[in-house]
A protein has these predicted regions:
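Conserved SAM-binding loop of SAM-dependent methyltransferases across substrates and taxa
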Residues: 62-76
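Class I SAM-dependent methyltransferase Rossmann-like catalytic core
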Residues: 2-53
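S-adenosyl-L-methionine
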Residues: 88-105
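Conserved class I S-adenosyl-L-methionine
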Residues: 53-65
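Helix-to-beta-strand junctions that scaffold the AdoMet/dcAdoMet cofactor pocket
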Residues: 53, 125-126, 143-145
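A short SAM/SAH-binding and catalytic strip from SAM-dependent methyltransferases
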Residues: 114-129
């Protein structure tokens, strides 16, 4: 069973490396099967889609292989930011920014987003009180007045 899963994952990675567009069309996912990810993908994304529809501007902070399918789960305009330049391939190429979560106001104007999703950053890049404060300050600045921070 483990060998079959490894082989399946290797095929998905190869397909993605060859053609991210085709991998997206085929619905390829590299998901993490954890309770928090299921809650985010099922409950929170459904709520965001109900509230924002296709017109909402959503920023996802920290994009990688395991959440590469998120732009396909969000109805609104999906934006992503990640510090690692290699992770650009996992975001929407047109709306991805390579940059720091502690410098959001450097990349985005005030009152830009309906939703900012900053899930799983503490201890994985946001490691100090100063970084946490900068993240919150930036999120507050770029969120619309009635915006939602997750």
């Amino acid at each position: 069973m483990a060998e079959k899963n490894k082989a399946r994952c290797a095929v998905k990675r190869l397909l993605f490396s060859t053609s991210p567009w085709l991998a997206a069309r085929l619905g390829i996912k590299f998901e993490m099967s954890t309770a928090d990810r299921h809650f985010l993908e099922d409950q929170l994304f459904s709520y965001i889609n109900e509230q924002c529809g296709h017109e909402g501007n959503i920023l996802f902070i920290g994009i990688d292989r395991y959440n590469w399918h998120y732009p396909r789960l969000i109805q609104g305009k999906f934006h992503s930011i990640d510090l690692n330049p290699r992770n650009k391939r996992y975001g929407n190429g047109k709306t991805h920014t390579t940059g720091s979560a502690t410098e959001l106001t450097r990349y985005y104007p005030n009152n830009r987003f309906d939703v900012v999703i900053a899930n799983g950053l503490i201890g994985f890049g946001i490691d100090t009180l100063e970084d946490f404060g900068a993240l919150l300050y930036g999120c507050h600045a770029i969120l619309k007045t009635q915006g939602l921070l997750i």
